From Swiss-Prot:
Subcellular location(s) of the protein: Cytoplasm
Modification type Phosphoserine: residues: 123
Organism: Geobacillus kaustophilus (strain HTA426)
Pfam families noted in UniProt: NDK (PF00334)
Protein name per the record: Nucleoside diphosphate kinase
Lineage: Bacteria, Bacillati, Bacillota, Bacilli, Bacillales
Assembly information from the UniProt record: Homotetramer.
Length: 149
């Protein structure tokens, strides 16, 4: 059964014109885009999104960075999309991320690593509901799915 994940191109990725490259990588893997929007993250939304890091020393920097410019928020659907997206993104630290991964190819530092993706079904559900209303997500079938699954 297909699952959904939340993927966000962070402000550094938007500024560096990487949205199209990132969308293309997910499409080429056969995943289906069901929601997307360019948006400015409010401080309140950023604090909710990063709530699990609230007590960490870098929390303020996370919030400041994610609110520093527009992000491109997306919901992708497909078989094992959460695990596959994590693999496609690469390690959080771009210096440790393998070449061919999004962070390995485009990330600069841990703080400017281009992309965020949900790390579990629970976080995917939470993050999707933070950034999207249900009516903003579009379910549809593609003929190519028969060739992929």
């Amino acid at each position: 059964m297909a699952e959904r994940t939340f993927i966000m191109v962070k402000p550094d990725g938007v500024q560096r014109n990487l949205i199209g490259e990132i969308v293309a990588r997910f499409e080429k893997k056969g995943f289906q885009l069901v929601g997307a929007k360019l948006m400015q993250v409010s401080r309140e939304l950023a604090e909710q999104h990063y709530a699990e890091h609230k007590e960490r020393p870098f929390f303020g920097e996370l919030v400041d960075f994610i609110t520093s410019g527009p992000v491109f928020a997306m919901v992708w659907e497909g078989e094992n999309v959460i695990a596959a997206a994590r693999q496609m993104m690469g390690k959080t630290n771009p210096q440790e991320a393998a070449p061919g991964t999004i962070r390995g190819d485009f990330g600069l530092t841990v703080g400017k690593n281009v992309i965020h993706g949900s790390d579990s079904p629970q976080s995917a559900k939470r993050e999707i509901s933070l950034f999207f209303k249900e009516e903003e997500l579009v379910s549809y079938s593609k003929q190519i799915n028969a060739w992929l699954y």
